[in-house]
A protein has these predicted regions:
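N-terminal juxtadomain amphipathic helix
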Residues: 37-105
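A short, small-residue-rich loop immediately preceding and capping a beta-strand
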Residues: 141, 145-168, 172-181, 257-268, ...
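Active-site/ligand-binding loops adjacent to catalytic centers
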Residues: 207-226, 230, 278-366, 407-409
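Phosphate-binding loop/pocket of nucleotide- and phosphate-handling active sites
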Residues: 309-316, 370-409
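A broadly conserved sequence feature marking short terminus-proximal activation segments
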Residues: 2-54
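Positively charged, low-complexity intrinsically disordered leader regions
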Residues: 83-150
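Short glycine/serine/threonine-rich phosphate/pyrophosphate-binding segments
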Residues: 135-139, 154-172, 186-189, 265-272, ...
């Protein structure tokens, strides 16, 4: 069935909007709601990434008002009391989960030798329950939705986040609404429809974000992803779900020197940075790894070269998971605070890298394969030395990638 195109004509969501079909027909579904998870008693609020102003936690995420008045569009982060006992505090204790996290860090000695580094590990996030790193963020986002008595998740997504949200919402007894685009891969669309998620189709990010922003103002709706332009990033507490990647990398492969991360708006990169920052503050590590954010065309690269952080940097790419024209303070901070940077990898380079990974028995979505091409660039420029311990983030495999299988390169 074809989902409706709303074209900015929004109506209040129906009162019985717990679950919908993609055609807009209500589904008579009764599911048990998951109990509220235990909130960390040391979680004190949300804090600005730039000015450190402290704000209460709500279901909306509109950035720092003080910085906005000064002309900056800056996200907030979770803030914990200084006497929090954990080296890596999280917003919620054990509760709702589908088994996300603790993904393997695959040691790839042959690829390490080929690319001239001492150690190369692939952090395989495709082993998460719905096949991507998004499950980590979604799990914490669902915990917040349950904590604040929300009944529906709403988000803008090109695929992986939508599938993750639909599965987790279904399991938790929540509704799910997804603002997407006409070309959403059929494999994703079928999963959303089967799980009762409602799809809305828009021509561009502006339309999708406007829809999510509108929905977020209604009682009981929780926006999981960004809805602001200039972009801010996803829900701050949800992004905390990426922090454990840092501890997993440390435990499984030692402290990396460099981590190469496919990036759209920087949620994943900032979450990894925050995890290592916690470990540094706790004395578990002596330094931060350098984070390299891989993009399909120049966005953050242009900002780091002097462009406006809140500018628009459009481009075309088959790397649909990391497409988009915006740059956030999140990704800028993740790169600059760690001494890393941005690497541009075009589609042909990414396809060639995906073939190299396939030869090593690794399936990767195109933007994840781009990380291997980025490693080659960083070695060629001597930004990464021969004695380095490098981790590549494999965000998802190729199975649902609309650009797969590749044409010959």
């Amino acid at each position: 069935m074809t989902s409706p195109v709303l074209d900015f004509k929004f109506t209040a969501p129906p009162a019985d909007s717990l679950a919908h079909s993609s055609s807009g027909n209500h589904m008579a579904i009764v599911r048990d709601r998951t109990p509220k998870p235990p909130r960390n008693p040391h979680l004190r609020g949300l804090q600005c990434l730039r000015c450190d102003a402290l704000y209460p936690i709500t279901l909306t995420h509109d950035g720092c008002p003080a910085c906005k008045r000064a002309g900056f569009h800056v996200a907030l982060r979770a803030s914990y009391l200084p006497d929090a006992p954990d080296a890596m505090p999280m917003p919620y204790g054990p509760g709702f989960t589908l088994g996300e996290g603790h993904t393997p860090l695959q040691d790839m000695p042959a690829l390490a030798q080929r690319f001239g580094v001492a150690r190369l590990g692939l952090k395989d996030e495709s082993c998460n329950p719905t096949g991507s790193h998004k499950d980590r963020m979604t799990a914490v986002g669902v915990a917040q939705a349950l904590d604040f008595d929300a009944h529906t998740l709403v988000l803008a997504s090109s695929g992986n986040a939508a599938v993750s949200a639909a599965h987790y919402a279904w399991a938790a007894g929540l509704g799910c609404e997804v603002a997407t685009y006409e070309g959403m891969p059929a494999t994703y669309a079928r999963q959303l429809d089967a799980l009762g998620a409602r799809r809305y189709v828009f021509a561009d990010n502006a339309g999708r974000w406007a829809f999510v922003r509108e929905r977020s103002q209604y009682p009981g709706y929780f926006a999981l992803t960004n809805y602001r332009l200039p972009a801010l990033g996803s829900a701050p507490l949800a992004i905390e779900g990426y922090k454990p990647i840092a501890l997993e990398c440390l435990n499984d492969g030692g402290l990396p020197d460099h981590i190469v991360i496919p990036t759209a708006r920087g949620d994943l990169a900032w979450g990894i940075y925050a995890g290592f920052r916690d470990l540094l503050a706790a004395g578990r590590i002596a330094r931060l790894p350098r984070l390299w954010l891989v993009e399909p065309f120049a966005r953050l690269s242009r900002v780091l070269a002097g462009g406006a952080l809140n500018g628009s940097y459009p481009g075309h790419t088959a790397q649909f998971s990391t497409a988009g024209a915006t740059v956030t303070y999140l990704q800028w901070q993740a790169a600059t605070a760690t001494g890393g940077g941005a690497v541009v990898v075009g589609d042909d380079e990414a396809r060639a890298a995906r073939q190299v990974l396939a030869g090593a028995g690794v399936s990767a979505e195109l933007c994840a394969a781009a990380g291997l091409a980025a490693l080659q660039q960083l070695r060629d420029s001597s930004a990464i030395a021969a004695d380095a311990n490098v981790v590549l983030m494999l965000t998802a495999n190729a199975s649902s990638d609309p650009s797969w299988p590749d044409r010959p390169v």
